């Protein structure tokens, strides 16, 4: 099962006790995938069309909780059409209740105007969270966090995407909108934003699972950075040792190591005998012992001597 499916499996079991939050979540399902049409006899009909079985389960549950509407009644139906499931509400008393609850009609039931969401329905913070949950359940997805972080909800219209983006930003989340083919996608790519969104939707188990992945990836990245740093330092050490040996060999083969002072010659001989030894190791072999900085100072003096010889011989330094 994908991580996105795991999140939705958790959310389908999440039910707010407050009726106003239930209405907000129901409004999200209708705003994302609902519409108003007319039957052959001219009566109004509400349809909810989805390819998501979990959305069907949650939508049916909300119909029952909010409006006491069951889908086994003769005048309301649920049909399969290929991958799609169509929930059709045709009983006029049920249609009226839903339209009025969603604020899709006036008080006299004379003017029908479906909207993505009426501002009054999501006025409270808890209702905004419920709406975001419903929108994600119906048209959202989250990538496998082991690969990359990406949260999105696909909207039909730009104004709908802007409303949803503003809701997420209300909670301090860095949501943005992009155009993809004929859709408008509300998305986030930062791990902490996604964990916070999972929390506000009520998917706390999925939030913890994502945290665990982020921690493990962070540890892995830290290890890689440390290895890269140590490799870079090792390369510098090797390059320095090669340069030191070339300097010493030049002096030995031209003017002789005995041209050096006793302290420099002692370090030079030890370096030739121990080409891969650290400066600290070389210092411990000296008599008397010398610290790392002392060895580095002597090798630098040897390098200066070698550069002087190169210049006198017309060799580029």
From Swiss-Prot:
Organism: Lachnospira eligens (strain ATCC 27750 / DSM 3376 / VPI C15-48 / C15-B4)
Gene: whiA
GO BP field: cell division; regulation of sporulation
Entries under PANTHER family matching the protein: CELL DIVISION PROTEIN WHIA-RELATED
GO molecular function (one): DNA binding
Protein name: Probable cell division protein WhiA
Organism superkingdom: Bacteria
Signal peptide: none
Alphabetized UniProt keyword annotations: Cell cycle, Cell division, DNA-binding
Protein task: Involved in cell division and chromosome segregation.
Family assignment from sequence similarity: Belongs to the WhiA family.
DNA-binding region location: 278-311
């Amino acid at each position: 099962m994908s991580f996105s499916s795991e999140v939705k499996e958790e959310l389908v079991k999440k039910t707010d006790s407050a009726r106003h939050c239930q209405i907000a979540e129901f409004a999200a399902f209708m705003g994302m995938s609902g519409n108003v049409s007319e039957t052959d006899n001219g009566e109004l009909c509400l349809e909810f069309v989805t390819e998501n079985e979990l959305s069907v389960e949650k939508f049916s549950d909300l119909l029952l909780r909010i409006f006491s509407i069951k889908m086994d009644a003769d005048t309301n139906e649920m049909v399969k059409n290929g991958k799609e499931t169509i929930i059709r509400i045709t009983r006029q008393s049920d249609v009226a209740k839903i339209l009025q609850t969603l604020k899709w009609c006036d008080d006299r039931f004379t003017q029908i105007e479906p909207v993505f969401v009426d501002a009054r329905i999501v006025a409270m913070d808890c209702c905004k969270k419920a709406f975001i949950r419903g929108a994600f359940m119906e048209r959202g997805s989250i990538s496998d966090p082991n690969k990359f972080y990406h949260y999105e909800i696909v909207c039909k219209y730009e104004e709908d995407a802007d409303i949803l983006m503003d809701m997420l930003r209300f909670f301090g989340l860095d949501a943005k909108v992009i155009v993809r083919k004929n859709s408008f996608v509300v998305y986030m790519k930062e791990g902490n934003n996604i964990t916070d969104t999972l929390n506000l939707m009520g998917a706390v188990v999925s939030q913890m699972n994502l945290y665990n992945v982020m921690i493990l990836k962070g540890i892995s990245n830290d290890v890689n950075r440390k290895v890269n740093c140590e490799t870079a330092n090792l390369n510098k050490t090797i390059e320095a040792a090669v340069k030191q040996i070339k300097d010493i060999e030049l002096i030995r083969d031209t003017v002789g190591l005995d041209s050096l002072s006793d302290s420099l010659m002692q370090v030079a001989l030890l370096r030739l005998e121990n080409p891969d030894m650290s400066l600290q190791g070389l210092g411990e072999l000296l008599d008397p012992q010398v610290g790392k900085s002392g060895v580095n100072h002597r090798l630098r003096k040897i390098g200066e001597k070698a550069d002087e010889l190169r210049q006198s011989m017309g060799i580029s330094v």
